[in-house]
Amino acid sequence: MRSVDSLLLLGLTGLASQANAHPAKRQPNDSPLSKRGVDLDAFRLPELAKYVPQDEVPDISNARIAPSSDYTKTAEEFVKSVVGKATFRLVSDHYVGTNGVAHVRFKQTVNDIDVDNADFNVNIGADGKVFSYGNSFYTGKIPGPLVKRDTSDPVTALKSTVEVLDLPVDASDAKAEPKGDEHYTFTDTSGTVKKPEAKLVYLIDGEQNLKLTWRVETDVLDNWLLTYVDADKTEKVVGVVDYVADLATYEVYPWGVNDPSKGSRSVVEDPWNIATSEFTWISDGSANYTTTRGNNAIAQVNPSGGTAYLNNYRPSSSSLEFEYTFSTTQTDPVSYRDASITQLFYTANKYHDLLHLLGFNEAAGNFEVNNNGQGGAGNDFVILNSQDGSGTNNANFATPADGSPGRMRMYLWTYSTPRRDSSFDAGVVIHEYTHGLSNRLTGGPANAGCLSGTESGGMGEGWSDFMATAVHLGARDTRSTNHVIGDWVYNNANGIRAYPYSTSLTTNPYTYRSVNSLSGVHAVGTYWATALYEVLWNLIDKHGKNDADTPTFDSNGVPTDGKYLAMKLVIDGMALQPCNPNMVQARDAILDADVALTGGDNQCELWTGFAKRGLGTGARYSSTSRTESFALPSGVC
């Protein structure tokens, strides 16, 4: 599955409901679907997962499982012990993380058909025992075997999808060509990036009922959708997942300079880390390039906003000198497109290398063409579109499953004269790329649709803001320093969020209960990033802050400073948590990540940070009435 996340749908929705919110700001561009009156939030999948952290896994559970040198076998036996007679299959994206924890995922099946939102993830510790697990398997009544043609025609499901979601797709003459067992590709359609597909799957709906559905995949560029259409009543859409999430020598704003208002451009030489980009940034191991293309990314302008990218304009330099002039006073984007593409290529590659060091490597599902035998599925660099003409005042990232390229689209912003190019705002670029990180890790690389709920989707936005903020902490920053997102592109010192990221409850009053009155994933994400900001500074106060571009590690693979340790624990937590987690579960996964990595050395700092913002030991999740808690577990500090 795939996810699409946008930067500027970001979080301005829901601000009016906050009595103490800042004055309303101009609303950045909505998605094309919302412009056509389609509310995708109404079709979000239910959040079903349960997460059992390491300190709650019963000892008897491990005692009942025969020891095995194959961690997948251990995980499989554990699932059998928990789910009884439920049928399931092993997903092929299992791997061992850099913290020594193996991640194994299973998909529930009914009548040999996948239950698309029923997942079981088992985390196996370095000792070979079950460390923690997540479970969203269906436990209700199982329907009988299907009778041939018990279901509607897949073409009807495609047409219903187009009609209900008002998609810009012509399916009037669509024909279904078999691709596999109850899996079809549609021909004679137009309006999509690639041919639409439909597959018969079960889905657990919001009423906890098991529905047989056609999963219809349509990539219309602005939205890359998995639409679940009732296979009995094909006019009814049961749920929707959107893969798109809205944000040599190179003359660039160097790493650490967030945008043109924060510093100056300079020429950097061979900026790649050969340990994480072994072919450099301008080769994929098979071909060497003299342009902004390589193993991790391909960058170009896309003024038409179309789907083609391979033959779009990008700068070329036989001498490998990507040095181009740029001034913020230039009014014509064409006049500085070389500088824009180069900056986007540089920032995305630098972030790729950093994430690789922190654990988002080939086996974990990162974005590379040639994985060089390191695991995972290749052929999936990130397509980086600068000056994308499909919109303004936004940015987005589409995350398909491992093995298909990610797609980032960076727009021009019109809140200033001249317009501002978001490719020069590293915070926006990092925000967008982080959607690829969180969607690939949560639920496993083969399932990029595990942040499709309101709270889990909100955390997706929060992780993106958090990582961008952590990267750009300044050398003189302290826990009293506040940070905002998008202030340069938005031409507003307050940025694009309701509040700055701050450890002050006066400056930013959000606590877990605040989420009850927030609407939209970007507003929810602001709270989550606020909680993580508290954790970040607690760890920095304990371990110090490394202001270098890359972390240093001790002999056990633990970052030696608080900033990179916080980022590492957040990333490791993503891999531990279940599909579509809530914030209490994600908190527990980060706490577990610390146990796995450091033996629990930072439990006090983590709990104190979360509890300050209402995610203490008594916090409870409910989609309509979250209960906050400021209490710490007994003896944790």
UniProtKB/Swiss-Prot annotation:
Record EC number: 3.4.24.-
List of glycosylated residues: 288
Position of the signal peptide: 1-21
Pfam families for this protein: FTP, Peptidase_M36
Cofactor binding, per record: Binds 1 zinc ion per subunit.
GO cellular component, one term: extracellular region
Active site per UniProt: 432
Maturation-removed propeptide residues: 22-246
Highest taxon, organism lineage: Eukaryota
Keyword Cytoplasm found: no
Cofactor needs: Zn(2+)
MF terms (GO), sorted A to Z: metalloendopeptidase activity; zinc ion binding
Primary residence: secreted
Protein's job: Secreted metalloproteinase that probably acts as a virulence factor. Cleaves Z.mays Endochitinase A (CHIA) between residues 'Gly-29' and 'Cys-30'.
PANTHER family referenced in this protein's UniProt entry, alphabetically: EXTRACELLULAR METALLOPROTEINASE MEP (PTHR33478:SF1)
Protein name listed in UniProt: Extracellular metalloproteinase MEP
Protein's organism: Fusarium vanettenii (strain ATCC MYA-4622 / CBS 123669 / FGSC 9596 / NRRL 45880 / 77-13-4)
Gene encoding the protein: MEP
